[in-house]
């Protein structure tokens, strides 16, 4: 499977486009950064590797951001396609899982109670919804933005509603 256009549009809305590199630890409202850090980000949430810094340090075009997002999504789609053993995901379930994985990362997703529960194993939470919404912390602190994002993703997964909660 691949993410749908509705899923892609939803992801782009949450990730927000930045044509200049910024620190994801500070957020989009920060000034563009002039040197690489582990949180260096560009486009729609693309984490810039140290080896990529010279390529992205002066910024990118909107088309390059689109291309980068599509390239990044290949790994997240492959993760969901490989790791989720549920017999058949609906498109909205798949979209929500790709969006979650994009935000928390492949390693976190593979270790998550969300994946365990989807695959019929016991997780650390009584319900899949609670396991999903547990990814609500930024640097160890509960984040209202992440609470809203997880609720929005859950609505996609459980209700097929692609609407951002603010």
Regions found by a protein language model. Name each.
Residues 97:
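Noncatalytic nucleic-acid binding interfaces
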Residues 41-43:
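Short hydrophobic-aromatic micro-motifs
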Residues 53, 58-62:
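Family-specific signature for flavin-dependent thymidylate synthase
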Residues 82-92:
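Short, structured surface segments that line ligand/substrate-binding pockets
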Residues 37-39, 94:
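Extracytoplasmic
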Residues 1-9, 13-34, 46-48, 53, ...:
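Long, amphipathic alpha-helical surface segments
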């Amino acid at each position: 499977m691949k993410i749908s256009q509705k899923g892609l549009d939803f992801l782009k809305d949450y990730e927000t486009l930045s044509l200049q590199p910024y620190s994801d630890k500070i957020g989009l409202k920060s000034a563009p950064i002039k040197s690489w850090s582990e949180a260096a980000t560009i486009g729609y949430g693309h984490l810039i590797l140290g080896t990529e810094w010279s390529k992205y340090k002066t910024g990118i075009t909107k088309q390059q951001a689109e291309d980068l997002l599509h390239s990044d999504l290949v790994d997240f789609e492959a993760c969901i396609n490989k790791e989720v053993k549920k017999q058949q995901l609906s498109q909205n379930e798949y979209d929500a899982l790709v969006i979650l994985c994009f935000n928390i990362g492949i390693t976190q997703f593979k270790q998550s109670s969300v994946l365990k529960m989807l695959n019929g194993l016991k997780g650390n939470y009584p319900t899949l919804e609670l396991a999903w919404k547990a990814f609500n912390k930024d640097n160890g602190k509960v984040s209202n933005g992440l609470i809203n994002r997880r609720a929005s993703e859950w609505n996609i997964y459980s209700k097929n509603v692609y609407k951002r909660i603010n």
